[in-house]
Amino acid sequence: MPLPAGTTSEKYMNALDRVLDKLVKFKPEFLILSMGFDANIADPLAQFELKSEDFYEITKRTLKATNEFTNGKVISVLEGGYDLNALADSAFNHVNALVENN
């Protein structure tokens, strides 16, 4: 979902909800989450304004929307993030949402 530089958490979540609506119609049998944490506002390469806690919400919303079809079959791939503290916090939040899903 292409979004402009400076995208806030609220605008990102609104766009995510539109994507999830389409994903639900697709009814995936499994889910591959490719999580790039360089969208964190603290990241030197960030062009978005996402907070570490937003990655929990992104993961939670995605899993909630797809659990009915995937039965919890999820592969998570961790990608970029260049501020080590922001990367650690974002990944922690993402993994917490995955763990809570079980």
Name every feature range the model reports, one short phrase each:
Residues 1-102:
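A general "terminal functional-core" signal
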